[in-house]
Structures are given as C-alpha cells and as structure tokens.
Amino acid sequence: MSSKILLTNLRTSASFCKTLKFPQRPRTPFIASQQSCAIHVDNPPSIPTLTTSYVHGLSSHPLQSSTVDQCLQATVERYPDREAMVFVQDGIRKTFAEFYQDVEKAAAGLLAAGLKRGDRLGMWGPNIYEWVLMQFATAKAGIILVAVNPAYQLQEVEFALRKVQCNAVVCPTKFKSQHYCDMLKQLCPEMETASPGGIKSSRLPDLHTVIVTDSQQPGSFLLKDLMQAGSSQHYQQLQDLQKKLVCDDPINIQFTSGTTGKPKGATLSHHNIVNNAYFTGMRIGYNWRKNVRICLPVPLYHCFGSVGGGVIMALYGTTVIFPSTGYDGRANLRAIEKEKCTFVYGTPTMYIDMLGQPDLAKFDLSSVRGGIAAGSPCPPEVMRKILNVMGIKEMVIGYGTTENSPVTFCGFPVDSAERKIVTVGCISPHTEAKVVDPTTGEIVPLGAQGELMIRGYCVMLEYWQDEEKTRECITKDRWYKTGDIASLDQFAYCKIEGRIKDLIIRGGENIYPAEIEQFLHTHPKILEAQVVGVKDERMGEEVCACIRLKEGQECTVEEIKAYCKGKIAHYKVPRYILFVQDYPLTITGKIQKHKLRERTEKQLGL
C-alpha cells in the first residue's frame, strides 16, 4: 500500500471516529509511587510486591491492534476444518471455514439491506447460531451490534432500541413465551404494509430493517434470503471497508444488566474486547492448550458469553459448545459428557444448579480440566464443591463488569485452592486497579477495604450518548468506579467484599451481606443464601436471610439462628429468615437485590 493511500485511509478513519465523539484512550501519567507498584502477571506473582492498594499489571505481551474480523480470519486460515461451534439442541455444527463463509454472506447481505458503517443492529434472542453469526457479520461490516436482552418485554425493548437509535433488528419469530415478532409489530404496526428494509416507524423512527431468522414476516427479511442478496458490488464494498475499519471503532453496545434503574448502553470497541479476550484466554492457557472445547451455557447477550465465548473462539481457535437455547442445568451436564468438553463457563447460580442435580454423579465429567465462574460473587463453599465434587481442579474466578469489557481480575489455573476460594484472582495485564476511600478518594492502605477503581484499555468508550451517566462512573482521568467494596493483597490478588449499594447499616454497624451469605453456605442443608437489609423503625435496617434449601431438606428458623450464634457477631445474625424457592434474576443470572428486598419487605409486612 502506498503512503498516500495509507494516509488517506487514516484520515478517513480519523474523520469517522471524530463524528462519533468518543473519548480517546488516555496516556497514563507517570506517577512515581504507582510505578513502584507495577507487577508482572504473565505468570502467578511469587514475590510480594505491592505496598499500597494500587497495582498496574505488566506483561511481556503487547496490546493487540487487530479488529475482530482480522482475528477470526487469521484463525480460519490456521484451522479451517476445526469445529468452531456446536449448538447441541439445534443440531448445528460449523467448522471455522463454514462459519466464515456464512459471516461473509451475512455481512454482504447487511450492506445490501442498506446498512452502513456505524449503524446499530439489535440482536434480540436466546443462544442460537444466528446470534454468533450476527456478532461477526456486523463486525466485518463495521456495524455496531447491540446486544438486546432476550427477556425484554414490550416497554423494555422499546426503551433499548430508542436509546441507541437502532437501525435494524435481528430476531427469531419466538422463543418459549417470548413472541419477538409480535412485539415488534406492536411497536411498529407499519411493518404490516412496509417492504423489507423500508419500515418507517413513528415510535422507532431510526428503525428501517427487521431480519427474522426462522420465518417470513411482513415487512421483514428472512435471514437465509438476505444471505444470498449480496452482489459482487456489495462484496467489493465489504472488501474496501476492511481497509477503513480500525481497532478504536465501536463494535458492540452491551446494556448493563439493570439490577437497579434503567439499563445503560456500555459502548465497547474492537480494542476493548479483542484485548480482553486475548489476555483472559492467555491467563487460562488457551494459547498453548490443544483441543479446547468450551461448554458455554451463559447468555450471548452478556459480555461473558459474547467475549469469553465468541471472541476467544476467534482468537484461539477454541470450539464452543452451546448446550441449549435457554439455560438448562441438566443440558449442561449432558453436553459436557457427550461433547467431551474440556472447559465449562457459568455464573455461580449455574454451578449451584449443576451441583444440585440429584444424579450428578452419573454424568461423566472426566474430560473437564478447567472453567470460569463469573458474573456475580461466588460463595467460597460453592467453589469448594466445584473443585472437589465436580472435580474441576483448574477452575478460576473471573471478575469484571460490562463496562470493563468485562474481565479485570482472573485467577490462574494453578492457583492454590485457598486463593480460588477467597479471591477473584490476580490483576489482568495492562490494567490498573486501586482501592480508595469512597468519601475522600484517597488510596487506602494495603489490605484495607474501599471502593475498587479500574483504568486501562478495558474501560468502555462511554454509555451510548449519555454524558451524564458516563461522568458519574468514569473520572476525568479515566478511572472507572466499580461500586464494589474490595481489598488487594501483596501479590495483586483481589477480594470482593460486597457492593456499596448493598451495604446494610444496622444501628450504625456496617454489615456486608456477602460475609453472612458465605457463612450460611457452610450449613449442610443450605443450597443458596442471599442476604438483604430490610427497613426497621428502631435500627434503621435489619438483616434478612432468604434461603434455598437442598432438595429433600427441611429446616427451621430457630435451627439457622442457632447455627449462627457464637460463630458470627450478634448483630450479623439475621433477624428475619425466609425459606424461598427462587430469587429474582437478570437474564445473566445475577441476583436482583433491590427486587428481592422489595419482595421480602412485602412478605414480612414492613
């Protein structure tokens, strides 16, 4: 390529990025005291290095500047005949070569439908092949994929699509009780008379294209037809586009899980997610392991699934096994056994469900070497059972947030059981973390508790077109406020103590629910425990434990209180104990504590 053409391409890319008004990745200022707390994390740190609650993870491996499509293309060239993914329930198997052919057809089809670089396409549905297909087709076409929660109802999906000005939506006709096309027709009755790609909606003025994966609907494209619509002109357009796409382009809008308030659109770039997948995969050892087959039950709509599954697949050539379209604990175990999975992903709740299967011992899990538990705090007792009952010895905890692409701390497979049980792992490469006093903002002494803050390549570009919310969580010098109470040790391992907003203040005493939850998990009859603060006229708040018992077990309030007495401080002993069958969850498996609190107070008549 001539220098003149290269300069023209760079100017075009720079001009495009400027129109989006995204903050640039900042240069980290040199701070002498912080430089002394840098630590190499390509391997588990063996020398106690940190002297304060600040750490900068160093690596001999540089940050990657590739786009998602460049990563996938390189892997396709290396392993064309290797299985890329298996959708067990739907009977779909694709090699990398077959998958990439579909990606190119779908990307050209999107251009044929009138979509262009920088447009937003909402993917609304469960874990189906078309979700992964759209993830990579949009990346190749320079279109921003919007991950829409498959459980959203009418008002929620309208809010999401309007928030990010979606130009297109891809969805199945329905899934279980979710009638996606019917809801879209309620929002856009104009679909009934519109031509495909020509929707003009009063409620969703930016939406002009609906693509249905499995049936022909009025005003919509059928995906398989769209994949044949690309002409030689569109393929040439696609080829020319590859010269203009850069790693700083936004690629993905992930809505925060909405455990409180309205969801916000965390906007991530190629640079964010490629590097997060690259260094997370390296931490687990995907760069040297052979024949890695990952059981992936977590939803694709969440970063854990799309980055930890899809982008890692594109980088390392791993095979991803999707056990079922919707979450099913037994389907996970069947898929592990049938497909000889070597790694398994899941939220703590998913592992609890698998551990709770009465015939768990009948499943052959001998192929599994390791896995990741992430998405919400993993109680120590649950981790012990994963290690000892399921026998997953190379299990690690991953910690992060959607806004951080998502992983910022992750364990090493060779870590001791104690580290796996007590911490969320070690700082990720090229990432800074500090623990500060939430009131003063000053870094706390090593080992002390405070709010965890993160800075580095992983921090999102912004909440989509929401400067106010972005400023609330990202400081002027690009530190992201996690809202988590944490502490660091000398080796750069992190312990999460709880959420600031979940803190219970009982008569002036600060109580972290996670501490009580971890203790309750040691009771032999308890499957899962969640603790919330409920209002109390005298104390301000009181502690309430909502407990799920193991199958076939019976227990009383008095038995639980007697178990607590003398083992935890008297003010931490729950005043109220409720035995429940389930908890309000987000689609990603996170407990919605605010809804649990509301439900509990109503049940108690408070």
From Swiss-Prot:
Entries under InterPro entries matching the protein: AMP-bd_C, AMP-bd_C_sf, AMP-binding_CS, AMP-dep_synth/lig_dom, ANL_N_sf
Span of chain positions assigned to the transit peptide in the UniProt entry: 1-13
Keywords: ATP-binding, Fatty acid metabolism, Ligase, Lipid metabolism, Mitochondrion, Nucleotide-binding, Transit peptide
Cellular component, GO, one term: mitochondrion
Keyword tRNA processing attributed: no
Pfam families xrefs: AMP-binding, AMP-binding_C
Localization, UniProt: Mitochondrion
Transferase as UniProt keyword: no
GO process terms (BP): fatty acid metabolic process
Main enzyme class: ligase
Catalyzed reactions: a medium-chain fatty acid + ATP + CoA = a medium-chain fatty acyl-CoA + AMP + diphosphate; octanoate + ATP + CoA = octanoyl-CoA + AMP + diphosphate
GO molecular function: ATP binding; medium-chain fatty acid-CoA ligase activity
The EC number(s) this enzyme carries: 6.2.1.2
Residues where ATP binds: 256-264, 484, 499, 590
Function (record text): Acyl-CoA synthases catalyze the initial reaction in fatty acid metabolism, by forming a thioester with CoA. Has some preference toward medium-chain substrates. Plays a role in adipocyte differentiation.
Record-stated family: Belongs to the ATP-dependent AMP-binding enzyme family.
Protein name: Medium-chain acyl-CoA ligase ACSF2, mitochondrial
Taxonomy of the source species: Eukaryota, Metazoa, Chordata, Craniata, Vertebrata
Gene behind this protein: acsf2
